[in-house]
Amino acid sequence: MTGPRLRIWATIVSLIALMLCVASPLCGQEKLTAIKGGDIYTITSGIVINGTILIKDGKIVRIGQGLDIPKDANVVDVRGKVVMPGLVAAATMGAAPSTDKIADSLDPFNYSVSMALASGVTSIFVTGRGSPGESVGGATAVIKPTYGDMDNMLLKEPAAENLNIASYRWMDRTNFILKMRQAKEYLRKLADYEKAKAKNEKLEAPRKPGDIDSYLRLLRREMPARLSADKAGEIMKALELVDEFPFRLVIEGGTEAWTVADAIAARDVAVILSPREKQRPNEDISQPSGSNVENAAILKKAGVKFAIIPAVSHFYMTMGGFAGRDLMTLPMDAAAAVSGGLDEQTALEAITITAAQILGVDDRVGSIQEGKDADIIVLGGHPFHYDTFVELTFVNGKLMYDKNKSVYFAHIRRYDEKVPGMPPDIRQIDPNALPPRESQRRAGQRPTPIH
């Protein structure tokens, strides 16, 4: 066969192979991953004991017991561990600069990203500062801490409209109301125009006032509004706005929400709260006030949807202690709500699926379900135990954090665990291997005198 003919046949064979590859569902896909043997807290469908999760192309494909695992699969043995969806941080502070788009300012190599993974957080609401004098503004997004992977970091943008109308700045509130009324009037005129246009095609559309796009999104309920309010009076003022303009509202803070829980529930307003936030009661009024450890439980009883965040909700939660053993992480604040009477299931939902619902990303994250993103964490114990570490964190099916390989946390262990390659802890030394006097001292006995 001559050279030109050989090249032609080689081209034909290559094209056929390419067509077969495109037609095959397996071609170009990642190898299947199986997380096997753990107790799976699905959040929405109970707990699967000694279960297996099959992951392919970043998605959960199957969940159950005794699943057939392909021989070439990447098997992660997590026997004796707790497996649950990655945590969802429904609010953060100082996570993004004041840019028009969060996507333009993301840094996948930021130290905070690795700390989020170590804390088991796989979805994070971030916000930038709005322009001074604007009652609505500031970029918002939901991101994933995909360390080193910029392409898969952004989950949703925009995610909400920030309301900058603090109770002590009456002008901001007045400006917000005026803009909302302008937007409401424009929508009324637009509806009238659409009806009349069928009879008169030459009719001119109403002129849209400037700077009302954000307000239109609120009135059309395309985007929720987020407003910081802690005291009962602040919360009630926010609810008055919902009465006049029926937009979707999320209250951040809600320290005294327990005192007006029924009013919040009646307007279908969500709350993002910190169970351990402290606020002294107002001694100048006769009504209940101040913080209450039963805040979350009271809101649950009233039918209010809420998410839980730490009192200091920085991008990576906080590093006041060690991630995974830090008393300021999401599970510890959820545990504080349980101590106030909230049931464990609702507390888990408040840091996973309910938080995802409030952020509008529950179709992808927040629970372990077939078809959802494989954002999964593996814990060394019960999520609400103070001594539990995050051991593995998967984002989009990829292992993003392994505690045993972490430069920050590999050496940190429970008191009864040995550290590979490290000298034994002083509490793990066999007393019989110690000199007699040292053994007696540790046993609380009086050492034998030396003659």
Explain the meaning of each model-derived region.
Residues M1-S14:
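Bacterial N-terminal signal peptides that target proteins for export
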